[in-house]
């Protein structure tokens, strides 16, 4: 699927919802544009600020304009220069700050108050704490007994599409992108005439947990929005794992269709919502997902 097709899908879905489609290319540009490049090295800078991210550490460059253009084109740590064989102080501090940010989002918990504020039912996997979640991924693939009973009692049975939200390995991915992806996603699915299940939040969930959810609720398509493992300095990236008619015993990873890198600096959440709606419709039409879908 090329960019033109994606933009057509976005316009179509947003039009059916009675909303104006965003300009994806402009959104991406705005998200990745840095402030004016800074060449002076100062440890007083806020390492998470736009000024620190725009810092250029190459001394006496042959083509300063090339470095300036490169620095403005990405939020990656480029043009940092060297001090002999070693990184410059500012570059090292930014590296450590980005690493800390990524580590924090893995270890943080999604606040219970936030889940309640979104009006979501909260269930959890067999995991009871973050340390166990990181060391026992197998337990994150199954719901606890209380969660199974809660889903049977409080969720719509036999939906065409079931949407699930899980913290995964990035708390920020959920809390930052939620408002921009879930409302247009739910509205788009309903506008498509699909029976949509009750969206809910799974704490300490792994990707394969959607198989059990689909089996319990009898969902034709399960869409899991889960926090991605963060990269250095990028802690807000969300992934969508969609699967048709999942079963715990038979569904394998090749049966899933993944849309990754959903955030303002990658695929904008609103654009991703439109693409997911189109994907769900095609899965239902073809009765397949993953590598079994015709492209």
Swiss-Prot record:
GO-annotated biological processes = amino acid metabolic process; ethanolamine catabolic process
Alphabetically list the UniProt keywords: Bacterial microcompartment, Cobalamin, Cobalt, Lyase
InterPro entries referenced in this protein's UniProt entry, alphabetically: EutC, EutC_C
Q: Which reaction does it catalyse?
A: ethanolamine = acetaldehyde + NH4(+)
Q: Which cofactor does it need?
A: adenosylcob(III)alamin
Which Gene Ontology cellular component annotation is one that this UniProt entry carries? Answer: ethanolamine ammonia-lyase complex
Annotated residues that bind adenosylcob(III)alamin are located at: 207, 228, 258
| Gene3D superfamilies membership | 6.10.140.690, 6.10.250.2060, Ethanolamine ammonia-lyase light chain (EutC)
The listed locations are: Bacterial microcompartment
Cofactor comment? Binds between the large and small subunits.
Stated role: Catalyzes the deamination of various vicinal amino-alcohols to oxo compounds. Allows this organism to utilize ethanolamine as the sole source of nitrogen and carbon in the presence of external vitamin B12.
SUBUNIT field: The basic unit is a heterodimer which dimerizes to form tetramers. The heterotetramers trimerize; 6 large subunits form a core ring with 6 small subunits projecting outwards.
Say which family it is in: Belongs to the EutC family.
Query: What is the protein's given name?
Result: Ethanolamine ammonia-lyase small subunit
This protein's gene is called eutC
